[in-house]
Amino acid sequence: WSAEDTGLLKQVEERGSIQVGLEATYPPFNYQDENGELVGYEVDFAKALAGKLGVKAEFVPTKWDGMLAGLETKRFDIITNQVTITKERQEKYDFTQPYTVSGIQVITTKDKENDFKSPADLAGKVVGVGLGSNYEDWLKANVPDAEVATYDENANKLQDLRVGRIDAFLNDRLAVNYLLQQSDGKVVAAGDPFDKQRMGVALRKGNEDLLAALNKAIDDLR
């Protein structure tokens, strides 16, 4: 007999907590406030999901480029980190129904706002993306002539944009307002968002009991 023989939902219930992977550096979704407390939409969402399961949410801050690997090696039970549901990812992981719908937004400096009317305008430009993100995948697949610069942290992309190391970066449309509020008008969203994206809670395959419970919880929270 091993823990694997009992479903993950049962393990979570017996443990009294669900372990949640997130970056903790991705405002407004999940980040640390000035007191070092984890806050943000997905922090609240994960706590609400846990509440529906009758357990606590236990957060495991993890860099994005190690996030899916962390799920596989069981560092946590689920991920709530704006994980876009893609065909490739669905082959390896299960996802709940979407809890946010977003798109890709080009972020650039005020003086270059008119250079980026459509995604095709990214060709020949240095474009920042999160390492291992679907933005990186999208850029390489759709604008092969763009020069790709990869980043671990959003803050570094913003910094490099300001000093001119990159011409633009790609980000989640839903995160944009927060970013722009922090940037004193020098940084702008250029063009319309594109490539509609659905974000779900990611978990390891073979945990139908937990998947069903999470989907029901999302229904209940709507």
Residue ranges and their predicted role:
Residues 18-19, 54-56, 73-81, 125-126, ...:
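Alpha-to-beta junction loops
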Residues 101-108, 173, 177-219:
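Periplasmic-binding protein-like
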